Amino acid sequence: MASEPKSLSLNLKVKDIVAGYGAVRALHGVSMSIGQGETVALLGTNGNGKSTLMKCLMGMVRPTQGSLELELDGHKYDLARLSTEQIVNLGVTIVPEGRRLFPKLTVEENLLLGAFRPQARPDIAKNLAFNYEAFPVLKERRTQLAGSMSGGQQQMLAIGRALMSSPRLLLVDEPSVGLSPLLVSTTITKIKELKEQYGLTVLIAEQNFHQAIRIVDRGYLIVHGEIVFEGNVASLESNDMVKNYYLGTA
């Protein structure tokens, strides 16, 4: 993946976001942040608003209140006022829940579809080579139809497709969904390797607490559309609220 110059900076501040679907409110004043080079987890069980926040960040759901302030290299943008295309062109890319591949296209064709951001087009060959180095199985199966791959292989392809856009901020929505425990561990490990090797900034929404905390710097626990706790890994593991509401062990 073509790397950005080290002088570039990124900071995302989610402020008091209220959002939902029609009359159903899914987020109730959510605030959080992520800075350059961080990996941050949005933790919580299904139905608590994690994916809704991800969709807000991508312009797929419009907040009714609050702001999504992205600062890039000294320039500020409110993602709540931008289209999905504009957000992607800023370098924000998502690995969606359920992977959302094109099953009747080959592995390589799916990867190439990820390079639609104008800034990524000059680096298509370089990013394709990067993906084949990072995910050898994709190179081995580059002519195979995506729909015929295993769930774990499809997850790797979904991550690779996102990396083809040379993202500044990578959103990963529920990477463990539909995968066996072994494949979940493999996927999380790969995200960790990519972060450490290339300095990616990653926001991961994940219900699997124990896997997520392996790779993150900080985390936020969201319950019923509200952030109820935030902290580093040590505080997440030791906090009674997290144990009670998420782990059920307090």
Identify the meaning behind each predicted range.
Residues 12-14, 27:
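Conserved structural motif at the start of ABC-family nucleotide-binding domains
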Residues 22, 40, 107-126, 134-139, ...:
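ABC-type ATPase nucleotide-binding domains, specifically the catalytic core motifs of the NBD
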Residues 58:
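Helix-to-loop junction immediately C-terminal to a conserved catalytic motif
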Residues 67-88, 233:
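ABC ATPase NBD Q-loop/coupling interface
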Residues 162-163:
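ABC ATPase C-loop
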Residues 166:
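Conserved catalytic motifs of ABC-family nucleotide-binding domains
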Residues 185-199:
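Helical segment within the ABC ATPase nucleotide-binding domain
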